Amino acid sequence: NEMVELEARRGKLALEQGKYMLQDAQTRIVEAQPAVVVKTLQRHGDLVETLLEQESHARLVMGRQGEQHQDQAQAIGSHLENVIRTVKQPILVVMTEFEAPKRFMIAYDGSITAKKALNQVLTSPLLKGLECHLVMVSDAQSQATAELALVTESLMAANFNVVTAVCQGEVQTALEIYQLEHHIDLMVMGAYGHSRIREFFVGSNTTKMISKSHIPLLLLLR
C-alpha cells in the first residue's frame, strides 16, 4: 500500500530530524555551559501528552515562536499555548534571544493563588541572587503598600533584595511601563485568583501578554 509506505517514510524522516535537533541542542548547551550534564529524550506522539508524563520532575523552557512563526516577532507557537493551558509545572517562555536576567518582577495581587506563586519563588533556587521587584496594580495605595510590606518581609528573610511599587491604572499598561523604567529582565507570573490580575493573566490575556512581551516570562501555573 503506497499510503502506508509513504507514512512510514515520513515517520522515519521525522525521527531522524528529531535526532539531529536534539544533538544540535545538546552540543550548543555543552559548548555554552561545559559543566552542565545534558540528557536527551526522544519520544513519539503528542507533545502535551509526553510532557504530562514527565510533569512530576520537569521544568520547562520553551521558545515563544514555533517553527512556522519565526518571522513573526509577536506570534505564539501553537505548541506553547497548548502546553501552558495543560501543564501545571513552571514554564520559562523565552524570546528569540536570551540573556541571564539580573532582576525580575512579580505582579502581585494578594490572592491565595498569588501567595502560592510567591511561595514557589521563595523556595526555588532559580531566582536567588536576582533583584526582586514586587509590583501591585491598585487604586488603594495605602492598603496595597501595607500588604506589600508583609510580603517583602518574607522575601527579605529568603535573602532577596526587594524593591516594591504600587502602580495605578490599567494592569497591562502599568506593568509594561514599570518594566521599561526599571530595566526588568524577567517577568514572573502566577495563576492568580479572581481579581484584576486574574482577568489580565488568564485566557486570551495570557496570550496577549506573552505575544507583546520583550522579556522572558516565568509562568508559575500550579
Model feature map: region roles:
Residues 1:
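Short, flexible, mixed-charge acidic loops at enzyme active sites
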